[in-house]
Amino acid sequence: DFVITSANLEQLNSTVNGVSYFKVNKEEAKTLDILEDLDFNIDKTLITLNGWLRIVPPDKCKKYNIYNGHPGLITKYPELKGKDPQQRAWDNIDNYNEVGSVVHRVVEEVDAGEIICEEKISTKYIGSLDATYDALRTTSFTAWYRFLKERLYN
């Protein structure tokens, strides 16, 4: 298992509890070419995108097991696909009875891959843009937890 990130984490370029952490620059991260230079079996590796906000090249979508978290309930509201779903969810909060997040497989088209899991919450608890962000953050964490628990422990 490994994590590739452009973030500054204490664990970078080391292995902690069997998980390897690699620091990459933005150019490497954009193309995911760094994956082919690493010494492990990429075919069995699970790659997750968290706040990636970049288009993954089509050849990488087909070649790797890549999953994305999206803070918009695109199963019910497909108009939330793409950039800034939190703001768009808040802008339409009066028309929605729930908001949520999904984890989906990454394919060539943005946010169009198979939905693996979703988490949602009623909009009756949401009264501001900040509350919308909080609700989507919470549902995102829960969706990722369920997804990873199923993939890693079943």
Please describe what each predicted stretch is.
Residues D1-N154:
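One-carbon transfer enzymes
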